[in-house]
């Protein structure tokens, strides 16, 4: 049975593409099969573009490649995916608002896995934090993706 994971952030150019690539890498290194991972945006501003160059650069620094093209979340994602992750409380509120009644997808905050409560929000590095913020988001994703995999996907 294939399980499907969708990473969500506001614009799908910073946090969610990093989380997508990190989750794929985490699963490959653990030899976990039958899991598909994608990412998408809450908003449609960047649809059709690539991830932020700082996100791509951060991933490259860790030997990872990002070829993702931005897309916006769709209603059918809530029935096609098993797990949909937000990066912060605003993402989670929007996901709950957008989710059709009776949706199959479990809505989760990525930082609730493996991170201390005070560090569970994966902050948007787009405006405030330069390259350092992207590295912080990457490191949070590494911890959270590994913890989620161990808790939910390696059973």
UniProtKB/Swiss-Prot annotation:
Its main location: cytoplasm. Cone cells and primary pigment cells in developing pupal retina. It comes from the Eukaryota. Keywords: Cytoplasm, Hydrolase, Protein phosphatase. It is found in: Cytoplasm. GO terms for cellular component: cytoplasm; nucleus. Transmembrane segments: none annotated. InterPro entries: LMW_PTPase, Ptyr_pPase, Ptyr_pPase_sf, Tyr_Pase_low_mol_wt_mml, Tyr_phospatase_low_mol_wt. Its EC number is 3.1.3.48, 3.1.3.2. The active site is at residues 9, 15, 124. It is an enzyme of class 3 (hydrolase). It catalyses: O-phospho-L-tyrosyl-[protein] + H2O = L-tyrosyl-[protein] + phosphate; a phosphate monoester + H2O = an alcohol + phosphate. GO terms for molecular function: acid phosphatase activity; non-membrane spanning protein tyrosine phosphatase activity; protein tyrosine phosphatase activity. Acts on tyrosine phosphorylated proteins, low-MW aryl phosphates and natural and synthetic acyl phosphates. Belongs to the low molecular weight phosphotyrosine protein phosphatase family. This is Low molecular weight phosphotyrosine protein phosphatase 1. The lineage of its organism: Eukaryota, Metazoa, Ecdysozoa, Arthropoda, Hexapoda.
């Amino acid at each position: 049975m294939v399980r499907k994971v969708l990473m969500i952030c506001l614009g799908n150019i910073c946090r969610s593409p990093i989380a997508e690539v990190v989750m794929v890498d985490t699963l490959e290194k653990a030899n976990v099969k039958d899991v598909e991972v994608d990412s998408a945006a809450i908003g449609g501003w960047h649809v059709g573009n690539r991830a932020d160059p700082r996100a791509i650069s951060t991933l490259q620094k860790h030997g990872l490649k990002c070829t993702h093209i931005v897309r916006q979340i769709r209603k059918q994602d809530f029935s096609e995916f098993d797990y949909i992750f937000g990066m912060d409380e605003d993402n989670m509120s929007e996901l709950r608002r957008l989710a059709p009644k009776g949706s199959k997808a479990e809505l989760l905050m990525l930082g609730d896995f493996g991170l201390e409560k005070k560090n569970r929000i994966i902050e948007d590095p787009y405006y405030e934090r330069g390259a350092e913020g992207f590295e912080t988001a990457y490191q949070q994703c590494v911890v959270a993706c590994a913890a989620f995999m161990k808790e939910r996907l390696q059973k």
